[in-house]
């Protein structure tokens, strides 16, 4: 058993160099994403299991495309991968093609042509850290019953969780030819028979390079910070993708506390001047999608003032 009481003694600079070397070894990295504003595609557990299995099948079909993480939501997906651009595009096209077949077979034909977006190339180490954190908290943002460490439909919950990875490494179940043909209406996937499954789907442990992705972070504490506290980086990615994400009171409060100390030289929001509160309220409203009630709670600002600034729709 790993001793989690032992703290890393590797100097910060050396840790960063190791992470940078890992990023360079990956080659070209990409963020595959589909439109957030889209009708419901996956609505049942069987739908989500089919989605998980399809990602696994595409990983087998494209062994030169390395999946670092992914999450499947009811109406959109996010994946972080490495590989040559044309192969990554072909991977994404296969995913969309067979998902359309699955939906048609369940009497819910949906045109997914809007999903064929050009993947966004990841620019540097900091960018890929932010993308992985963004993906691994995406399901948590849309499902209040989950956390970034428990949402079931993706690779997120296996990060820095060796016990769960070990548990998912053992299975007596596997995908059958009958299931593949019935689910995806094709004989082309017969070669994927025998993939081990847990509770009806292929575990991400068997087809995602989670250990490689973990080495892009200095340690588990660094990863936890990126997922749970670094909301400014998350907001930047959302703006680039044209997505809207929402934050909890605690996340927004941590952001405001940081602004109080760095820009206004006070320790707590109640100590801000009224003008400073109004300026921060605009940032929270326009950049972080905070509603008036959230802003009122965090900044101790009168709700009537906020309703006049941002009239309820």
Model-derived segments and spans:
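Histidine-centered divalent metal-coordination motifs
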Residues: 76-78
């Amino acid at each position: 058993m790993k001793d989690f009481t032992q703290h890393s003694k590797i100097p910060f600079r050396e840790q960063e160099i190791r992470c940078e070397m890992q990023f360079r070894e990956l080659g070209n990295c990409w963020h595959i994403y589909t439109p957030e504003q889209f009708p419901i595609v996956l609505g049942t557990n069987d739908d989500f299991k089919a989605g998980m299995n399809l990602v696994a099948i595409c990983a087998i079909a494209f062994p030169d495309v390395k999946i670092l993480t992914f999450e499947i939501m009811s109406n959109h997906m996010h994946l972080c991968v490495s590989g040559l651009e044309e192969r990554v595009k072909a991977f994404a096209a296969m995913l969309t093609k067979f998902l359309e077949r699955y939906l048609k077979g369940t009497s819910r034909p949906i045109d997914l042509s809007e999903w064929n977006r050009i993947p966004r190339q990841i620019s540097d180490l900091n960018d890929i850290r932010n993308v992985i954190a963004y993906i691994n908290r995406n399901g948590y943002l849309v499902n209040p019953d989950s956390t970034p460490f428990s949402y079931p439909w993706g690779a997120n919950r296996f990060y820095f969780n060796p016990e769960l990875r070990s548990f998912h490494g053992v299975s007596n179940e596997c995908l059958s030819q009958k299931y593949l043909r019935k689910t995806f209406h094709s004989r082309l996937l017969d070669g994927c028979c025998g993939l081990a499954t847990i509770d009806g789907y292929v575990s991400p442990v068997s087809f995602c390079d989670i250990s490689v992705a973990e080495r892009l972070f200095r340690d588990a504490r660094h990863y936890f910070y990126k997922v749970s506290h670094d909301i400014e980086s998350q907001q930047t990615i959302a703006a680039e993708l044209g997505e809207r994400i929402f934050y909890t009171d605690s996340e927004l409060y941590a952001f405001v506390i940081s602004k109080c100390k760095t820009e206004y030289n006070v320790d707590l929001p109640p100590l801000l001047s009224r003008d400073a509160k109004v300026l921060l309220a605009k940032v929270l409203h326009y950049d972080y999608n905070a509603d008036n009630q959230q802003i009122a709670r965090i900044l101790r600002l009168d709700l009537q003032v906020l309703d006049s600034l941002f009239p309820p729709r």
